């Protein structure tokens, strides 16, 4: 517990200095797909979604702002396509489609659904050390309500590994074990801020320690 507390303090300084999220820019991994070759099938599937009532709904904050983001989520050397849409007529309007390369085409692999009206931010990090990146999604329902949901890379409709309110968060490997730990700053019912330290243990994300802050933390 003492070790977790020390890591929490170290990580907190990194989080506060970094702004909303602490990430290492990988600009080559986040770009709009080329509209040629194997990307033609991806373009066709995206066009079908738009034709059927979906609209682009790119994240509005952070370093990953494209409506379609190309990134190798599973470490196999091929990029997956992560596409962000909104379908206002659905009970869960926010949609995150994941397409995987299959030979000379892209096939739909998973759809993440959210009840919020807006995706605030998205980040990708391997939190459990299995070589697959989890998807960290910041939802925003109003000017003062934010929720963080973390999804695994799994087929179908992935269920969140963790859902919580937050003001800021950071993911970084604080103890050198090859896994990304998670720091989340949030406010309680008395508007007092605290930072929670999460680590992957026994098949799930667990809150290891918590530190109350002397003042609230604005977004």
Predicted segments with their positions:
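Sec-dependent N-terminal signal peptides of Gram-positive bacterial secreted proteins and lipoproteins
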Residues: 3-25
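Beta-propeller-forming repeat regions
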Residues: 20-219
């Amino acid at each position: 517990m003492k070790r977790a507390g020390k890591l929490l303090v170290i990580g907190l300084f990194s989080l506060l200095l970094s702004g909303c999220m602490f990430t290492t820019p990988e600009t080559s991994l986040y770009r709009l797909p080329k509209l040629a070759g194997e990307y033609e099938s991806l373009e066709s599937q995206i066009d079908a979604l738009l034709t059927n009532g979906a609209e682009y709904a790119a994240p509005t904050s952070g370093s990953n702002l494209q409506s379609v983001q190309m990134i190798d989520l599973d470490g196999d050397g091929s990029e997956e396509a992560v596409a962000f849409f909104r379908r206002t007529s659905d009970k869960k309007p926010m949609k995150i489609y994941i397409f995987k390369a299959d030979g000379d085409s892209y096939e739909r692999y998973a759809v993440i659904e959210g009840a919020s009206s807006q995706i605030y931010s998205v980040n990708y990090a391997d939190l459990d050390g299995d070589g697959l990146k989890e998807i960290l999604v910041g939802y925003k329902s109003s000017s003062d309500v934010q929720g963080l949901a973390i999804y695994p890379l799994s087929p179908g409709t992935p269920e969140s590994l963790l859902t919580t309110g937050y003001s800021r968060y950071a993911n970084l490997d604080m103890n050198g074990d090859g896994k990304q730990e998670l720091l989340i700053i949030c406010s309680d019912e008395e508007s007092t801020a605290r930072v929670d330290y999460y680590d992957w243990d026994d098949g799930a994300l667990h809150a290891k320690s918590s530190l109350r802050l002397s003042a609230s933390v604005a977004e």
